[in-house]
Amino acid sequence: MMSVEAIGCEGRKSPKHRVKEMDLATAIEETTVALNLFLNNKFSEARAIFEPWSHASIYHALGHGTISYLQAVMTFDPTDIQEAIKWIKNSIEVANRFRKKTSVMTSMSKMMWKTNYNTYTDEEVHAELCYAESLLERAILSFIQDDNLINFIKGGLKIRNGYHSYKSCVQMFENRTWPSARSKQQFESGVKFGSGTFNLCISMLPKRILKLLEFVGFSGNRIKGLTDLERASKLPCLRSPMCSMVIISYHSIGTYVFGTADGDIELARQILEPCLKNYPKGVIFLFLAARIEEISGNLDEAIDKFQECIASQQEWRQFHHLCYWELMWCHAYKLDWPMAAQYANKLCEESRWSKAIYHHQQASFLAMHLPRTDACIQNINDIYAKVPELKQRIAGKSIPMEKFAVNKAKKHLIHGTENSLVGLELIYIWNGFSILAKKKELLEPVLLLTEATLQQLKKTKGSASRSSGCYWDDYSLAMLLKGITLRYLSRPSQAELCFQEVISNERDLHYDHYLVPYATLELGLLYLQYDRLQEAKTFLTQCRHHNKKYMLENRLHFKMHAALDNLKTKMTQSSEIPAQDSLNLEGEDEERTGPEEDGLEMSIASEASQDSLDKDGPIDGPGTNLKNKDQDSLTGDGSVDGPMNKVGPTEDEIARTNDKEDQDLSSGPR
C-alpha cells in the first residue's frame, strides 16, 4: 500500500489534499483514465487526476511526468522541456522511495546467489519499473535539448542507470511468482515498452557517440525493440497507446530525421488505425496520421489533416506550432514558396523554439519566389540580418542548426541569393528529399529548377574567379541537389557524375565545405541502392573520416550510421560474402575486440555479456568490387578512389550521359 500523504505541486503538504492509502491496482486504473483523457485532448482534466497524488503514488508521479514529457518531445518548446524535466525528476524520486531497499550485506549476497524476487512486493517491482521508465524519459529529453556531443553523453549516462533497472525488471518478470495475473501483464507491458524504446533509441545513435560511452556497456537492437513494442501495443494495458505512439513515430519521423527514410509506412498505418478509433480527435494521433500522408507524398491530404489537427484543440497552443512547422514543409515540397514563408513567419511570431532558424527559413523561402523586386530583396536582407542576433546559447553551447542558419545568413547578406537554391538546400538538410522521392511529379519540377540554375550560373562563370566569391559554392550546391534528384528518379549514372563533380570542387569552396562530405555520403548511398557494396562501404566510411570541420557534421553521422547498418545487412545476405567473414564497417584502422551485445533481451544470460559495447571483429570484407550487371546499373570501371583523388566529370561527359539515359524529363533551359 502507498500510505504517504499527498503533497501539493509546490512541495508543501496540503491539508486540502490529505488522502488515505491507495493500492497499486487503483493507481494504475486512475493513471489509465488520466492518460486516456490526455490523449483525447482533455489535458487539464488529466493533470487534475495526477496532481494530488504526484508526490505520493508511483503511477501518478510517472503519469504526470509522462504527459509533460510527451508535450516536450512533440513541441521541443524550451518551457515544456523544463517543465517535463521537473516532473520526471519528481517521478524518479517517488519511485526511488518505493523501490526495494538493499543493505550492504544484501548487495554482497547478490554477487554469490541469485536474488529471490518473491520477497519483493507488487509495489516494489512496479516501483523499479516506474523508476527505469522515468530515467529513460529523462535521457531522451537530454538528447532533444540539443544535438551536441555533451548532451548525447549525458543522455547516455542517464540511460545507463535505466538500462540496469530494466535488466532487473526482466529478471523480476521471469523469475517471480506473480500473485495477480493482471499485475504481471501490466508489468510485462512496461518492460517491453521500456526495452523496445531503449533499443530503438540506442540503435539510432552514431558509432562515434557509442564509442565515447564504451564504459557504459550497452548497445541497441532495432529489430528487438520494434518486436517488443509491437507485442506490448497489443496488450490491453496502460502503456499500450504509448507503445503504438513510439512505433508510429519511429517509422514516420525517426527514420526520416535520424536515418535513411526506410520506415515501414504500411505498418505505421495499421497500428494507427485502432488508435484513431479510440482517440478520434486526439491531437497526437491526428498529427501522426497527417505525418504519414506527408511522408507518403500525399501533400494535399497532409495539409488538410494538419489543419484538422490544429482545429481539434485550443488548449495546447504549442502543438499548433508543430503543425505550422509541418505545413511549412508541405508547401515547400510543392515549391509553393510564399505559403512556406507565411508559415515560417507564423513560427517567428508565435514559437519560442528557435527564432534564428525560423527567420532563416522565412528569408530563404522568400528568396526562391520570382520575380524579385528591389523591395522584396531588401525585405529578404532585413530578415537575414536578424538571424545572428537571434542565435541562442544553451548551457554555453550553440544549437548546430542555428550556427548553420547564422553562417548562411551572413553569406547571403554579402553575396545575395541570386542563383543560390537556398530553399531547396533547406529541404535537403531537413531530410525532405526522401519525401519528394515518393512522387515523381514532386521531383520533376525540382530537376528543372536545378538545371535552370546551373545554366544561369554557367553564364556568369567567365566573370567569376575560382579564388573569390561564392560561385563554386552555389554551383556545387545546385549540382548536389541535381544529383540527389536524379538518384531518386532512377538515373544513377547521371547522379554519380554530379556527386563526383561536387567532390572535385572541394578546393574551390569558400563557405559551404559541408557539401563535399555530404556528396560523398550521397555517392555511398547511391552505390548502396544499386548493390555496389564495396564502393558503398568505401564512400560511407570516407565521409566519416573527412579531415575538415564542417557544418551539420552530427546530422551526417546519423545518416551514415543508418546507411552502414543497411550495408552490413546487405553484405551479410550477399552470396558473394563468405559466411565466416565478419565486417568492419567503421574503418580498417580500428582494432575492436569483444562480443557484440544483442540489445536488451528478455533473457539475460550473464552480467559479463552485458558489459561489452557493440564490437565487431576486425575482419575486412572481400576485396572484390560488387557490380550490378543489369541495364540500369551504374557505369564505371569499378575503381574506388577517395574524394581527394577523384577527378570530376567534364561538362561533355555529363552531356553524353544525359543523352544516353532516360529522356522522360525535360532537361530545362539550355
Over which residues does each language-model region extend?
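Long, intrinsically disordered, low-complexity tracts enriched in Ser/Thr with interspersed Pro
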Residues: 580, 585-667
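Generic marker of "main functional regions" within proteins
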Residues: 48, 98, 105-108, 144-146, ...
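Short coil/linker segments at helix-helix boundaries
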Residues: 16-30, 37-45, 63-274, 295, ...
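Eukaryotic intrinsically disordered, low-complexity segments enriched for acidic and Ser/Thr/Pro residues
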Residues: 1-59, 74, 273-283, 288-291, ...
